[in-house]
Amino acid sequence: MLPVLFWENSIGRSKSSDVTVDDPTVSRNHCVLLRRKDGWYVSDTDSKSGTMLNGKRTRGRAKVLIDDTITIGGTSLIGKRGEEFQQPLHSSWFFSKVSDKPAMKSWKLMLLITFFHFFMCVQAMFWNDGTNTMAPLVLFGALAAVEWGFFFISYFVIRRVNFELESLALFLTGIGVMMLIRQSERSAYVQLVAAAIGMIFFCIIIKLIEDPDKVNKLRLPAMICAVGLLGVTIVFGKITNGAANWIYIGSFSFQPSELAKIIFIFIGASSLDVLMTKKNLLEYIIFSAVCVGLLALMGDFGTALIFFVTFLLTAFMRSGDFKTIILAVAAAIFGVTFVLKFKPYVADRFSGWRHVWEHTQDNLGYQQARVLTYMASGGLFGVGIGNGFLKQVAASESDLVFGLVSEEMGVIVAFTLAVAVGAMFIYARAITTRSRSTFYSISACCAAGLFVVQLSLNVFGATDVLPLTGVTFPFVSAGGSSIMSCWGLVAFIKAADERTYSVKR
């Protein structure tokens, strides 16, 4: 007997299949057995010999009942109830790590986060300048109102049973908002408003992707929207630091590529029976190539790199085939060589990489040298919010925010922020094995992976471990488009938790 362990199960000859059938007449990825609210279904995935249900060839999804016979190649499989399977299941990483120990109460976690943000407020009130001492307190009040308002809506209106993921996001968001109060009070409030809008996006996206089957119908409109956003940026975008990635409408500005990240994750994931068809894979490859190409044309190579690495992660999760990854990397190397030849300012960044102390007075090393210097002066506990010198350097609140946090709040807090982002990836990895659909599993892991890639480029770029690419620190860097995008991406991780839709208070 072969156990069926997941909501969506691939059946085939491949060792990577959820149900492996040792039969040469069976295709490597032959069909998918999936569970929905109204029962179980089988769907052929472009196999050579097709899939038969009770002697009849299936077309699309076919409902499977107990004792029905599924025939693939020369093998027949009969559906039985789970209690009839008597063999012990082998322990794995997926199952052995699940704990019944209750988590900390959500309201207690929120209190800890609020206290931390309040301590930041007090520290900012007693800065060296000594002026406008009450501004941080007013901002903290507004921040606390947004955070607790979001908590009460989630807990008592939507009636969700868990709030751990949102707490991590609120912790990071609040730090980003409070760090801005001694740089630009207006920017701090803009960031807070953008975060509140992002929380609304979070709720909308979770509702939008509630049914993984209906989501597939939105793929084409979403593709058109993403390509349209990037195309409009090429035409109307204003060139800033060599990249035309901002659109200005009066005093309002936004970065369409940040919103395109959400769509990119959305397009990359599908339910398993759709995912394993050649048409779906080809569509995604073409869409990814167009997005990365448009980003390269506008000169936003940092975001292009994030998209490409996310594509690699998605492609591997979809196929488990290293050959696909190797071919994609080879194509990327060719593309990078082409870019370096025709975009000399990009090559200049590489020439300054690992040599910032030789370029402390020019664009190749000025920012990184200051980050390293002021991080050292901040030590473990920092010099206090508003008392640092890095805030006088361009992009200190966005591209260099890791250095700013290290100087003003200490390396311990800065490292904690990086760990918090990494914890989102661990959370996503842990919950996806129990997701209701491969759509949720892939989108959650890829969204969390995107955060980790973005974090790495930001932290290591600012500290000269990698070339400075100008990408933001998730949730913490200043930027309305960035914070809204981050909250939108968190929705994919939240949706992968089966408790989000199946359990209410």
Identify what each model region corresponds to.
Residues 431-470, 476:
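Loop-to-helix entry and N-terminal half of a specific, functionally important transmembrane alpha helix
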Residues 278-297, 301-341:
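Hydrophobic alpha-helical segments of polytopic membrane proteins
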Residues 2-75:
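Forkhead-associated
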Residues 240, 244-246, 253, 326-417, ...:
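Hydrophobic, glycine- and aromatic-enriched re-entrant/interface helices and adjoining loop segments
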Residues 1, 75-120, 124-134, 285-288:
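Regulatory inter-domain linker segments that are low-complexity and enriched
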Residues 161-169, 186-194, 205-229, 247, ...:
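Interfacial loop-to-transmembrane-helix boundary motif in multi-pass membrane proteins
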Residues 142-146, 196-201, 407-426:
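Hydrophobic alpha-helical transmembrane segments
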Residues 456-505:
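A juxtamembrane structural motif centered on a specific transmembrane helix
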